[in-house]
């Protein structure tokens, strides 16, 4: 929500840069490159908020995500869907549509949490809280 309300043209350019490279990384199956671009995208979105607390939270979350990347738990077949979702988030922010941006980001986060739970269940055989 804050990203859509506060994003400047310069902020949007920083969000669009990794987003523009994500489709090629997804298409060619370059998982590490895609995940690095994903981290850059989310950091740029956090910077759009101009809220240091949210930026710091994103930095901390990036550290956790990097651990997941090293474990290789992102399936290649999810990348194309991810590109589309990220593009929708960017478009909502660029339109300064805070309601859509917040809804899309919440759905994105919820999807990530559900995916992580499924991975944990598949790897450890029990449902995670």
Identify what each model region corresponds to.
Residues 29, 74-77:
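Structural signature of alpha-solenoid helical repeat scaffolds
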Residues 1-70, 84-92, 100-111:
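Conserved amphipathic alpha-helical segments that form helical-bundle/coiled-coil interaction surfaces
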Residues 73-74, 85-86, 93, 117-121, ...:
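Short alpha-helix boundary/capping motifs
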Residues 98-129:
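C-terminal effector-binding regulatory domain of bacterial HTH transcription factors
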